């Protein structure tokens, strides 16, 4: 058993395990360790001096968990759960319902939504309940499953965002090359999940359920990492590898891909004779696309940077644990599951139509047909169209001449903010 790694990981959870008011008549952990209750701890490889040293270190940054803080956390995490489930389930519903939207790009969007749903269901509620109850109540099996779901979902999300960025780069920078087929998209998604599983297994395997008698009437459990020796180095380099593979490398690829795309969209020239109104419309669309690409990178970087840095610094022993910081950073990272559906799909016309139809059904309007478009065929262009041979269908009534497809120029109307996800 890795002593130091497990001991350091115990810090934030055992702080949360303290009584909210910290009354003197409650023995708590220190009394249990110092007195006869020490035998109630189910640890086989620790000496009593280890626990005495740990109790002394536990005082760093200790803060009480009062009912107000717990209530705020319940509201904050509930907000994430509700909006994440609603947005991501709606994304899957819209894409599976519309056959025109079934392309490789759509598969990546669904895969991202599934990863967000997985972490919303198998990690976010467990973190909340663990904090509110000051103990792990889900058993040994879920101790491993929850940690695996957290890391696997994060890897899948990062790799899928990278795949989407590479796909957008391919479409815009090389418009004459064949698109990724649905079959290849399925293969790429399989590879993504295989890689995510491989990277997540060490975290899941090293989880262990520890049980101790907190007081005469209370027995509590903690789901914590239990790294093999040398535990310090194992923990440090595992978190470092996760930080690089889960955050730095995907962010670097996404940033480079979208920077090149933004440059191409901004510098590309309008082909053919267009009016001033048409030119201004294309320029607005160009700015809109660039803003969306920048938003994707910024949100991905901002949401995960605090938590990744906190975990990395903690495993490197640069900082001590801080309960308030941990839950603030964790909530901020988990909130990223709410943003992706709106970033990638909210500006898509088909998505808006299905959302209006769904809301009409929920409200039981007498004439829901009024919310639907007059014709299933759009008058300007068809989003996400793709033939089986991987080439795009030329849009009708386009502002730009179709002859530019043979000149290697980029058609702005086919690359709306991921927007049309063409």
Curated annotation (Swiss-Prot):
UniProt-listed SMART domains: 7TM_GPCR_Srsx (SM01381)
Superkingdom of origin organism: Eukaryota
Cytoplasmic face residues: 92-106, 167-185, 260-292, 348-422
Pfam family, one: 7tm_1
Membrane topology, Extracellular segments: 17-70, 129-144, 208-237, 315-326
InterPro entries the UniProt entry points to: GPCR_Rhodpsn (IPR000276), GPCR_Rhodpsn_7TM (IPR017452), NPY_rcpt (IPR000611)
Keywords assigned by UniProt, alphabetized: Cell membrane, G-protein coupled receptor, Glycoprotein, Membrane, Receptor, Signal, Transducer, Transmembrane, Transmembrane helix
Topology in membrane: Multi-pass membrane protein
GO molecular function (one): neuropeptide receptor activity
Keyword Membrane listed: yes
GO biological process, one term: phospholipase C-activating G protein-coupled receptor signaling pathway
Compartments, record wording: Cell membrane
GO cellular component, one term: plasma membrane
CDD domains to which the protein is assigned, alphabetical: 7tmA_GPR83
Function of the molecule: G-protein coupled receptor for PEN, a neuropeptide produced from the precursor protein, proSAAS (encoded by PCSK1N). Acts through a G(i)- and G(q)-alpha-alpha-mediated pathway in response to PEN. Plays a role in food intake and body weight regulation. May contribute to the regulation of anxiety-related behaviors.
Leftover remarks: NPY has been reported to be a ligand for GPR83. However, a more recent study found that radiolabeled PEN binding to GPR83 is not affected by NPY concentrations below 1 mM, only very high, non-physiological concentrations causes a partial, displacement of PEN binding.
PANTHER family: G-PROTEIN COUPLED RECEPTOR, G-PROTEIN COUPLED RECEPTOR 83
Protein name: G-protein coupled receptor 83
Annotated source species: Canis lupus familiaris (Dog)
């Amino acid at each position: 058993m890795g002593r130091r790694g497990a001991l350091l990981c115990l810090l934030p959870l055992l702080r949360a395990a303290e009584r909210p008011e910290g009354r003197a008549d409650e023995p708590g952990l220190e009394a249990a360790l110092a007195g006869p209750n020490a035998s109630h701890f189910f640890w086989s490889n620790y000496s009593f001096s280890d626990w005495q040293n740990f109790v002394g270190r536990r005082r760093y940054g200790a803060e009480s968990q009062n009912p107000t803080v717990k209530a705020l956390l319940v509201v904050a995490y509930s907000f994430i759960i509700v909006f994440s489930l609603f947005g991501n389930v709606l994304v899957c519903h819209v894409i599976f319902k519309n056959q025109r939207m079934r392309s490789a790009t759509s598969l990546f969007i669904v895969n991202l939504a599934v990863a967000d749903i997985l972490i919303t269901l198998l990690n976010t509620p467990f973190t909340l309940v663990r904090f509110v109850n000051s103990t792990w109540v889900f058993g040994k099996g879920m101790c491993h499953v929850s940690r695996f779901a957290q890391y696997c979902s994060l890897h899948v999300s990062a790799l899928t965002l990278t795949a989407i960025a590479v796909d957008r780069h391919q479409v815009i920078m090389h418009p004459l090359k064949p698109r990724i087929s649905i079959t290849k998209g399925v293969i790429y998604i399989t590879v993504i999940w295989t890689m995510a599983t491989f990277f997540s297994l060490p975290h899941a395997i090293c989880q262990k359920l520890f049980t101790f008698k907190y007081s005469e009437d209370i027995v509590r459990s903690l789901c914590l990492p239990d790294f093999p020796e040398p535990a310090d180095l194992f923990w440090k380099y595992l978190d470092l590898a996760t930080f690089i593979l889960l955050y730095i490398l995907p962010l670097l690829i996404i940033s480079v891909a979208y920077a090149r795309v933004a440059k191409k969209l901004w510098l590309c020239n309008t082909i053919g004779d267009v009016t001033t109104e048409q030119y201004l419309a294309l320029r607005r669309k160009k700015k809109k696309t660039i803003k969306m690409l920048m938003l994707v990178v910024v949100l991905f970087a901002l949401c995960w940077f605090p938590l990744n840095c906190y975990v990395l610094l903690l495993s490197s022993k640069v900082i001590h644990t801080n309960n308030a910081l941990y839950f603030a950073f964790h909530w901020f990272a988990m909130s990223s599951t709410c943003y992706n559906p709106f970033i990638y799909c909210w500006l898509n016309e088909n998505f808006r139509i299905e959302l209006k139809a769904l809301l009409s059904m929920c409200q039981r309007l007498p004439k829901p047909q009024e919310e639907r478009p007059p014709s299933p065929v759009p008058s300007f262009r068809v989003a996400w169209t793709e033939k089986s041979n991987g080439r795009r269908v030329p849009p009708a009534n386009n502002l730009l001449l179709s002859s530019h497809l043979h000149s290697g120029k980029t058609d702005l109307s086919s690359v709306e903010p991921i927007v049309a996800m063409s």
